[in-house]
Structure formats: structure tokens, C-alpha cells
Amino acid sequence: MKLYQRQFIEFALSKQVLKFGEFTLKSGRKSPYFFNAGLFNTGRDLALLGRFYAEALVDSGIEFDLLFGPAYKGIPIATTTAVAMAEHHDLDLPYCFNRKEAKDHGEGGNLVGSALQGRVMLVDDVITAGTAIRESMEIIQANGATLAGVLISLDRQERGRGEISAIQEVERDYNCKVISIITLKDLIAYLEEKPEMAEHLAAVKAYREEFGV
């Protein structure tokens, strides 16, 4: 685990974005941890979040031309990541996001920002069922662009309805790499360093045994 990943886990814990306990997910599964990126909800939170996304992007080595944030949660993420790439990595990248409802006046269309073209890096908070990615792919392909990769904050590394995860399905269906700031494996490595969190470690490991990929 790299320094920025450990710092991201501590940031998420401090903002209660990441919690340990017992939580019922939308899928009905009982999970020993919960991650709600919507609680990164202040200016300082967003500035820090962008830096972590930018670190993960640079670390990945994936080449791309433009950042795309799917509405709605991906919009502030794409924006803050673009700012962080410019301020901290001297990479001034175009960014773009979609509207859920197309405008019929003014600039019109369902896209805001730079022209959607070239190799696109899609940024979002998490991938649960992959629905937002599929909707975004239709927009990307309709504009003649290609998907270079997907960046999310957390990869839960757990099976969907079948034997593989929603992330693995996206990688298979769109022949792209999905990267994340942290994974379930990183969370476990972090918990292993914290004796006071031993009860949570046991629960997370048991969950991985049952649902992990």
C-alpha cells in the first residue's frame, strides 16, 4: 500500500465516509463496512479528494486525453481531479460531464465542458452495478471517443450476481482497465496495522471469504 492510499483511508475514516460496523447494502448483503463518498461535502474535502484521484491517475500510468464525470456524482469528482492534475502535476487536462436532461436552449445538448473526444478517462465514486458506466459508454461512443479507463475511489472486490464483480464485468465488456484509489485488499492491510481494530479485521476478512473475487 502506498502512502497516498493510507492517507486516503485515514481521510475517509475522519470524514465518516468509511465506517466499520454492520450495514445492509442495496443488494441485501450484510457488510462489515460502508463507504459513502457523498460525505466528502465541503470545499476542503473536495480539494483533498481531487489530489487523491490525481495521485491514482498518475500512479496508473494509463494514457488519456480527457476526464469525463458522469452526472451527478462524477461531476464534482471530474472537476476537482482536473484542478489537482493542473496544480500538483502540471497537466492541464480538458474535462467534460453530461446532463441528465438535454437542454433545448443556450449551448444545448447533453454535454458540458470540453468536446468529448480522444481517449477518455471516466471518473466516478464507486461502481455498484455498472449501470452509470454503461450509460456513459453510450455517450462516449456516440461522440466518436474511446474509453481509456475508469477511475473510482474504492473497489470492493466482491462478486456481483454471478462469479465476477461489477468492475470485472466492465473491464470485460469494454476492454478497459478500472483503477481505484483503494481496494478491499488495501483496507484489510490497513486494519492489520491497527491492533485496536482487530474485531473489524476479522469481520472484513470473513466477508471477503464469502463474497470476494
Swiss-Prot record:
One of its GO terms (molecular function) is magnesium ion binding. Its EC number is 2.4.2.10. It catalyses: orotidine 5'-phosphate + diphosphate = orotate + 5-phospho-alpha-D-ribose 1-diphosphate. One of its GO terms (biological process) is 'de novo' UMP biosynthetic process. It comes from the Bacteria. Gene3D superfamilies: 3.40.50.2020. Orotate binds at residues 34-35, 128, 156. 5-phospho-alpha-D-ribose 1-diphosphate binds at residues 26, 72-73, 99-100, 103, 105, 124-132. Pathway: Pyrimidine metabolism; UMP biosynthesis via de novo pathway; UMP from orotate: step 1/2. GO terms for cellular component: cytoplasm. Keywords: Glycosyltransferase, Magnesium, Pyrimidine biosynthesis, Transferase. It is an enzyme of class 2 (transferase). Its cofactor is Mg(2+). The keyword Ubl conjugation does not apply. The keyword Transferase applies. Belongs to the purine/pyrimidine phosphoribosyltransferase family. PyrE subfamily. Homodimer. NCBIfam families: pyrE. HAMAP family: PyrE (MF_01208). This is Orotate phosphoribosyltransferase. It comes from Escherichia coli (strain SMS-3-5 / SECEC).
